[in-house]
């Protein structure tokens, strides 16, 4: 009888990839980054094991949105107190914290459990084109 291959955490060889978000739609950048973080780009993908690689997203401030989402897309957060709902448009978030927009988009595409939190820790997002991970020799990911 044949059995399905299940990767073990010790078997995983992690790589580093750089994604340049300049001029690319937010959803496409987030989907590719989430795919790499989960490990779905490798043949040894196992759903319950973190088989993903590290991802560095550069130029997060130059990511684009299609349509009227620049003004219509809203981000919300709540303090937990009555009347504590805060809403921010995409435009104001882009002015204040553009890296947070990319992080939230990618985090929403990862599993919502402890494994997803572990995979999210392998994500690094930078506003400019410079990053501090040259020692890891990251490969450029084109899509």
Curated annotation (Swiss-Prot):
| Database matches in Gene3D superfamilies | Ribosomal protein L13
Has the keyword Ribonucleoprotein been applied to this entry?
yes
Q: Name one GO biological process term.
A: negative regulation of translation
Q: Name one GO cellular component term.
A: cytosolic large ribosomal subunit
Provide this UniProt record's keywords sorted from A to Z: Ribonucleoprotein, Ribosomal protein
Q: Which GO terms describe its molecular function?
A: mRNA binding; structural constituent of ribosome
Similarity field = Belongs to the universal ribosomal protein uL13 family.
Enumerate the NCBIfam families for this protein: rplM_bact
Describe, as the record does, how this protein assembles with itself and its partners.
Answer: Part of the 50S ribosomal subunit.
Function of this protein?
A: This protein is one of the early assembly proteins of the 50S ribosomal subunit, although it is not seen to bind rRNA by itself. It is important during the early stages of 50S assembly.
The name this protein carries in UniProt is Large ribosomal subunit protein uL13
* Record gene name: rplM
């Amino acid at each position: 009888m044949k059995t399905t291959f299940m990767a073990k955490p010790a078997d995983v060889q992690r790589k580093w990839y750089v994604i340049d978000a300049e001029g690319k739609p937010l959803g496409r950048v987030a989907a590719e980054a989430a795919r790499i973080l989960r490990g779905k780009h490798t043949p040894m993908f196992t759903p319950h094991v973190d088989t993903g690689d590290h991802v560095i997203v550069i130029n997060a401030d130059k990511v684009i949105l299609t349509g009227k989402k620049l003004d219509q897309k809203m981000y919300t957060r709540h303090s937990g107190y009555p009347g504590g709902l805060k809403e921010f448009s995409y435009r104001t978030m882009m002015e204040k914290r553009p890296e947070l927009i990319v992080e939230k988009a990618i985090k929403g595409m990862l599993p919502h459990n402890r494994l997803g939190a572990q995979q999210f820790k392998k994500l690094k997002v930078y506003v400019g084109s410079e990053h501090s991970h040259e020692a890891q020799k990251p490969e450029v990911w084109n899509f």
